[in-house]
Regions:
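Hydrophobic ligand-binding cavity/cleft-lining segments
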Residues: 1-38
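A generic structural signal for beta-strand entry/edge sites
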Residues: 1-3, 50, 83-85, 113-117
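Short, surface-exposed coil-to-beta transition loops
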Residues: 5, 38, 70-74, 100-105
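Structural motif
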Residues: 11-13, 80-82, 112-114
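Hydrophobic pocket/interface hotspot
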Residues: 17-18, 27, 51, 77, ...
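Glycine-rich portal/gate segments that line the openings of hydrophobic small-molecule binding cavities
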Residues: 39-89
């Protein structure tokens, strides 16, 4: 298992970023890499609240972690500090033992020149997930988050 850290500046205040992190309709739009679509099945945005999300590859290829062309994960919100931090525990729904195990996902918001520096740390990522893929997917999601909050096309 390993840890990744990805950050990005967003031209929006921490309050707006925090709200977008916890809005299931917004999550379906931004928390997904390019080339995939997102479906939020369950989303209880409170400490201890559960969520379940599926990402689906748009093309014909793309081996999913949970099934053909699909990555489904579930988890719960461990800590919610308004306008500062969201901590989640996440697990892939998979039959592959190499992809199993809980990951901790911490998103930290730091005020930065009228905007927000968003830092995403994944801890406990299974070794079967290439680190470059995890980092690239997180970077793409943060690009979509910025586009959504800044009111510009992706």
């Amino acid at each position: 298992m390993y840890t990744t850290r990805v950050s990005r500046h967003v031209d929006a205040p921490p309050l707006a970023v925090y709200r977008t992190l916890l809005d299931p309709e917004a999550v379906a739009r931004w928390r997904v890499p390019y080339g995939m679509t997102c479906r939020v099945h369950e989303f209880d945005a409170r400490e201890g609240g559960a969520f379940r999300v599926s990402l689906r590859y748009e093309g014909e290829d793309g081996a999913g972690k949970s099934g053909p062309r699909t990555d489904t994960y579930h988890g719960r919100f461990v800590e919610l500090v308004p306008d500062e931090r969201v901590v989640e525990v996440v697990e892939f729904e998979t039959a592959d033992p190499l992809l199993r195990g809980a990951m901790t996902l911490t998103t930290t918001l730091v005020p930065d020149g009228g905007g927000t520096e968003v830092l995403v740390v994944h801890e406990g990522v299974p070794d079967a997930v290439p680190a470059a893929d995890n980092e690239t997917g997180t970077r793409m999601a943060l690009d979509r988050l910025a586009a959504l909050l800044e009111g510009r096309p992706e």
